[in-house]
Amino acid sequence: MMKSESESYKAAGVDITAGYASVELMKKHVARTMTAGCVEGIGGFGGLFALDAAGMEEPVLVSGTDGVGTKLKIAMLLDKHDTIGIDCVAMCVNDVICCGAKPLFFLDYIACGKNVPEKIASIVAGVAEGCVQAESALIGGETAEHPGMMPEDDYDLAGFSVGIVDKKRIINSETVRPGDVMLALPSTGVHSNGFSLVRKVFAIGNGGENRNYPELDKPLWETLLTPTKIYVKPVLALLKEIQPKAISHITGGGFYENIPRSLPEGCCAKIKKSDVRVLPIFDLIAREGSVPERDMFNTFNMGVGMTITVAREDADKALAILHQNGEPGAYVLGEIVAGEKGVELW
């Protein structure tokens, strides 16, 4: 098929042929994500997916969309783009599974100042890896070149995930009661939130990214670019055996904003601070930036990427399932008590 070209459009800053090259380079990455529901490959006007709702009485679709935020600035600074797509997928699918839904498919959106095919392919390679981890098909996406609106080296990345759950299995806060137990799934680090503060604390962009700290087992930049953990597989394994009462993805706003989102009125999550397994990077941020403890717990995940609330009698079984399915570090974080809706850290 003859490809279209526009020298005039290229002179204005949009290179159509670079777009074609990007698509060709990313095809092998997208192919890794294909699942039984995929109907066609990429390149059409819409992504097609055949829905299999077998065994569900009332199938409900669940959607989630998010981006990576200013963590992208570090990826751009270091010209390392192959893992940032994992973050994008994680931010979306981890939200979807909080409802008890199995992610089905994913789409990405990249806006850039200049389409450099190799860079775009590297970004999409990360998105594809995230989709593989989430057992979700990458069925489409968009790369938009924005000359004059964005600097040539800049880009933004966002994603969109769709999952499915039987209506009777939807997880919400309605059944949470005092006496329930809250479990913690450890994070891999800062994940994808709080990076505006992180960049300020460490003077990222002014050489701070290259510093080494004895409490970190790798250079600072590598610690900060560690991808957000994807919790899909362990949570789906848990859902086969136990119906959790609530799940919270600990993102922007930390404990104080995200945990209450999965609590009903009259219930408070009581957590002993010494029981939180805080990762070294957070102690380092607090020390280097003189950040108050309250602000730390109100900004970062502090080493807890996801919380799962279960009935007390299900706690041991839930931990065993998580330990056997990729979350050996899962632990009891706290309990639900009667009180004002919120979080009590003591």
PLM ranges: what are they?
Residues K28-T188:
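Glycine-rich phosphate/pyrophosphate-binding loop regions near the starts of catalytic domains
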Residues S22, M26, L48, C92-V93, ...:
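Buried hydrophobic packing segments
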Residues M2-G37:
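N-terminal amphipathic/basic leader segments beginning at the initiator methionine
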Residues D156, R169-L220:
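Short, acidic (Asp/Glu-rich) active-site segment that either coordinates a divalent metal cofactor
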Residues A53-A54, G67-V68, V162-I164, T188-V190, ...:
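Short, glycine-/Ser/Thr-/acidic-enriched flexible segments
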Residues K3-A11, K119-A134, M150-L157, E209, ...:
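Glycine-/charge-enriched secondary-structure boundary and capping motifs
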Residues V23, A121-V124, F195:
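Hydrophobic face of alpha-helices
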